[in-house]
Design a protein with these regions (language model features):
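Alpha-helical transmembrane segments and their immediate juxtamembrane cytosolic regions
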Residues: 1-220
Length: 220
């Protein structure tokens, strides 16, 4: 009887996770579609001059944040992220080359696809270790790390609205653009550096882990 109940529980758990993944994948697809719509309207309003004063930053920022979090939440459902990571890095490189050649006034360097490629390649080999932390604890630590590092591009570390540290200027330059420490002359229409966004990605990963742990607790 116990084996039968355990098997029924595993089946119901598997069905619940599959349903969660379907919902999350649909949201992720909607987020990428939203990004495509954004660039379509950006091209009309800003690039072509229909409305040069169009305030687009908030829309772009929220869309990129949502993509990073959702990709983190769906990370556990995949397996071959070496292939995905290299593929996304290739897409990001192609986008950078195309914008450099065809729209040099609106280039995209180290955008969302480049970041996701790096995130997949970095997180996959340590995913087993990250899972040792409870979802709630991992999410909290990732959120704190994100908050501490989200102003690195400005050369400061801020905690609860107060500057608690300054980074030396020699750390900033072309060699550290990918990390989140660009030089003063760096320009990119879409910039998603490794820091602080890797912690936002981990927030998504741990949020899904917490949801899964919570459901298992309810089932018991």
């Amino acid at each position: 009887m116990e084996k039968l109940l355990a098997k029924m529980y595993e089946q119901s758990e598997s069905k619940a996770e599959k349903k969660q993944y379907r919902v999350l994948n649909a949201l992720k697809a909607a987020a990428f579609l939203n990004l495509a719509v954004f660039y379509f309207l950006y091209n009309i309003n800003v690039a072509q001059g229909a409305n040069p004063a169009w305030d687009y930053a908030w829309w772009q920022r929220l869309t990129l944040w949502s993509i990073v979090v959702l990709c983190g939440m769906t990370f556990s459902q995949g397996s071959n992220y070496l292939k995905w990571g290299l593929g996304l890095l290739g897409v990001g490189t192609a986008i950078s080359l195309c914008t450099y050649i065809f729209t040099p006034q609106h280039p995209i360097y180290f955008g969302i696809f480049t970041f996701l490629g790096l995130a997949y390649l970095v997180v996959q080999p340590i995913h087993w270790w990250l899972q040792k932390s409870p979802g709630s604890c991992g999410w909290l630590l990732s959120a704190i790390a994100y908050d501490l590092t989200r102003h690195l591009t400005d050369g400061v570390i801020i905690w609860q609205g107060k500057i608690i540290g300054h980074l030396p200027s020699f750390l900033y330059g072309d060699w550290n653009v990918w990390l989140g420490l660009p030089g003063a002359d760096f320009v990119s229409l879409e910039y998603v550096p490794f820091l602080p966004n890797i912690f936002l990605f981990l927030c998504g990963l741990y949020l899904f882990q917490f949801m899964s742990e919570h459901e298992k607790g309810q089932a018991y």
